[in-house]
UniProtKB/Swiss-Prot annotation:
<protein>
    <recommendedName>
        <fullName>Ribosomal RNA small subunit methyltransferase A</fullName>
        <ecNumber>2.1.1.182</ecNumber>
    </recommendedName>
</protein>
<feature type="binding site">
    <location>
        <position position="88"/>
    </location>
    <ligand>
        <name>S-adenosyl-L-methionine</name>
    </ligand>
</feature>
<keyword id="KW-0489">Methyltransferase</keyword>
<keyword id="KW-0808">Transferase</keyword>
<dbReference type="InterPro" id="IPR023165">
    <property type="entry name" value="rRNA_Ade_diMease-like_C"/>
</dbReference>
<keyword id="KW-0694">RNA-binding</keyword>
<feature type="binding site">
    <location>
        <position position="64"/>
    </location>
    <ligand>
        <name>S-adenosyl-L-methionine</name>
    </ligand>
</feature>
<keyword id="KW-0698">rRNA processing</keyword>
<dbReference type="GO" id="GO:0052908">
    <property type="term" value="F:16S rRNA (adenine(1518)-N(6)/adenine(1519)-N(6))-dimethyltransferase activity"/>
</dbReference>
<keyword id="KW-0963">Cytoplasm</keyword>
<feature type="binding site">
    <location>
        <position position="16"/>
    </location>
    <ligand>
        <name>S-adenosyl-L-methionine</name>
    </ligand>
</feature>
<dbReference type="GO" id="GO:0003723">
    <property type="term" value="F:RNA binding"/>
</dbReference>
<feature type="binding site">
    <location>
        <position position="18"/>
    </location>
    <ligand>
        <name>S-adenosyl-L-methionine</name>
    </ligand>
</feature>
<comment type="function">
    <text>Specifically dimethylates two adjacent adenosines (A1518 and A1519) in the loop of a conserved hairpin near the 3'-end of 16S rRNA in the 30S particle. May play a critical role in biogenesis of 30S subunits.</text>
</comment>
<dbReference type="InterPro" id="IPR001737">
    <property type="entry name" value="KsgA/Erm"/>
</dbReference>
<feature type="binding site">
    <location>
        <position position="109"/>
    </location>
    <ligand>
        <name>S-adenosyl-L-methionine</name>
    </ligand>
</feature>
<dbReference type="InterPro" id="IPR020598">
    <property type="entry name" value="rRNA_Ade_methylase_Trfase_N"/>
</dbReference>
Amino acid sequence: MQEGGLPRAKKRFGQNFLVQPQIVERIVAAIRPASGDHLVEIGPGPGALTKSLLRLLPQFTVVELDRDMIAGLRALAPPEQLRVLQADALEVDFAALAGAGNALRIVGNLPYNVATPLIFHILEHAEQVRDMHFMLQKEVVDRVVAMPGSKAYGRLSVMIQAYCAVESLFTVAPGNFFPVPKVDSAFMRLIPHRPGLLPPHLQAPFARIVATSFAQRRKTLANNLRGILSADDLRGLQIDPGSRAETLDQAAFFRLAEATVEQGNRS
């Protein structure tokens, strides 16, 4: 144990424990948990948020990778109220976790090193997720919510916004965590689109065209997409071949993905 009775944070898990009760209250107010919610908390650590949720929910699930946290979490409530899974959230089958019940509400203070892959892992089951509320590095949140033409706008913005409505709710200073991180954090909300914007057959082509378009940010689309779509193809899609990926909106990337599928069908 370290000061304040907190378990020792482990660098390999990217642990920074939230220690400010007022921030916990803001998180709970943003989530607005209600009886009947199928809520999953990822990375509860010593349980600062978990304890507040237990006062409001008759039952929910936490997923914690660190074995040393498990006994403390299980001591917070009986198993019929708090289901504790010792697991890597990147390997959790969220579709199976949802089962035939209500869509999942997922919340967590995510380690910076796994936040992005974890969000994409959860989005593989977006149809079984009602919403997500995450504490992330502020720089990552800024990139997720960025709009075309801004410096922060990039592959991450386009990909996540294709699946979710996104909103940055509030910024959290480093001093609200222990150990104190070197950067600001931000709390954000992601709500999967209903119905989804991307049909299944377009999801892989969309991911490929977005990755290729942003592969070299300083290059034009005509250069980045050479061998995939010609300058004339781009003009036919009402896209300037001389523009850069960070100027394109979501609809333009949808058109690019559809064009690559049509091209593949013709060849």
